[in-house]
Amino acid sequence: MVAMVKVLVVAKVYPDSVERNLEEMVENIKKSLPEGYELLQYQKVPVAFGLNLLKVYVAMPEETEGGTEKLEEVLKGVEGVSEVEIETVHRMSY
């Protein structure tokens, strides 16, 4: 049996305002992810002056053409997202 290899991508997702509902953003991110991608967990991280960002942990297929580019585009397309920064990428298998 061949193990399916995925990568774990940790990304910082910045909201467009302090008032943005981060739980709603998480739900929209889940709905927006393509087949084969999975939001494993997320954290709210304080930035400054009441602004929080989302740190999202997404599993995606390793053999994705363009690497994390597709994921970045999907995340940037979610309502309320102003910026996306890929923090780390780790290979995982299960």
Curated annotation (Swiss-Prot):
Keywords in alphabetical order: Elongation factor, Protein biosynthesis
Function: Promotes the exchange of GDP for GTP in EF-1-alpha/GDP, thus allowing the regeneration of EF-1-alpha/GTP that could then be used to form the ternary complex EF-1-alpha/GTP/AAtRNA.
Record-linked Gene3D superfamilies: 3.30.70.60
Protein name: Elongation factor 1-beta
SUPFAM superfamilies with a match to the protein in the record: eEF-1beta-like
Gene Ontology molecular function: translation elongation factor activity
UniProt family annotation: Belongs to the EF-1-beta/EF-1-delta family.
Keyword Protein biosynthesis attached: yes
NCBIfam families: aEF-1_beta, PRK00435.1
Gene this protein is translated from: ef1b
